[in-house]
């Protein structure tokens, strides 16, 4: 886990920035916690595998995506285990850090 007292980050909602990211791990949070921290989700997937996704860009350039994957039988508001995507495991650590503040 990345332990920083101040982590610079922003949710990106006006453009797609998650090209070539892949699964790096998962985090536990409620939908409401994520909305409170990052705002409304950026979107969903056309194939229905993802109901909600957030994109986060950290100050060091790390990009992370937070999304429910194949939670077909669970309403998005009830999902508590979220996949984290990125280009490295650092993405998961940074997401864990901002969730634990």
Predicted regions and their residues:
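Residues within mature, well-folded domains
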Residues: 2-101
């Amino acid at each position: 886990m990345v332990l920083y007292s101040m982590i610079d980050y922003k949710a990106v909602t006006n453009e797609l920035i998650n090209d070539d990211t892949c699964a790096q791990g998962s985090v536990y949070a409620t939908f409401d916690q994520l909305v409170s921290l990052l705002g409304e989700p950026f979107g969903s997937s056309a194939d229905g595998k993802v109901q909600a996704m957030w994109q986060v860009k950290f100050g060091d350039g790390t990009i992370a995506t937070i999304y429910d994957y194949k939670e077909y039988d669970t309403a998005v508001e009830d999902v508590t285990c979220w996949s984290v995507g990125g280009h490295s495991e650092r993405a998961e650590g940074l997401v864990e850090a901002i969730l634990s503040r």
